[in-house]
A protein has these predicted regions:
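N-terminal Rossmann-like NAD(P)+-binding domain of SDR-like oxidoreductases, especially those catalyzing
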Residues: 1-175
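ATP-dependent carboxylate-amine ligase catalytic core
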Residues: 179
Length: 179
């Protein structure tokens, strides 16, 4: 199941999962994604289902219960350009909803995608390569929220056994990218 699967990065993941023979459930509210981004995935002819849902909705939790995916990809989180506090503040309830659905329905792993700059702050060339666990020297609401999201993932792993992976992306570009 790919939340944010009609977005730039999510739609590429959907194609890869289909190419690998997986059936894929895409959940997207289309607030920033587009059905056009799934055109190539639909043409592949695999098992693809689209659900126009917000991850904070009861319908989303019910869908997770019905489909019971092993892995839940949550790519509907903080975009690198997230600067307005309202969109940043929405990330926590979105992730909590995904984690609760995962906990209640036996999902084994959650994978999230967060811009590396929000996790690590600005890194100067002399500090490369960045080591995992490096303290975030960035100050601002988006950076604090990114760390909060990672902390929530850790809590759910410790308390509920839900494994997680954080993809810390940098300078992602390509087809279907918004201008």
């Amino acid at each position: 199941m790919v939340c944010g699967g009609a977005g730039f990065i999510g739609s590429h993941l959907v194609e890869r999962l289909l190419a690998d023979g997986h059936s894929v459930e895409v959940v997207d509210d289309l607030s920033t994604g587009s059905l056009a981004n799934l055109g190539d995935a639909r043409a592949m002819g695999g098992q693809l289902r689209f659900h126009h849902l917000d991850v904070t909705s009861l319908e989303f939790a019910e869908l997770v219960g019905l489909r019971r995916p092993d892995v839940l990809y949550h790519f509907a989180l903080l975009a690198p350009q997230a600067s307005d506090n309202s969109s940043v503040m929405r990330a926590v309830p979105m992730l909590l909803s995904v984690l609760e659905a995962a906990r209640n329905h036996g999902v084994k792993k959650v994978v999230v995608c967060i811009a590396a700059g929000l996790i690590y702050g600005e890194v100067h060339a002399k500090h490369l390569p960045v080591k995992e666990g490096r303290k975030n020297d960035a100050i601002g609401v988006p950076h604090v929220m990114a760390q909060t999201l990672i902390d929530l993932l850790g809590v759910y792993r410790e308390k509920h056994g839900i494994e997680y992976t954080v993809l810390a992306t940098t300078n992602v570009y390509g087809l279907r990218q918004r201008e």
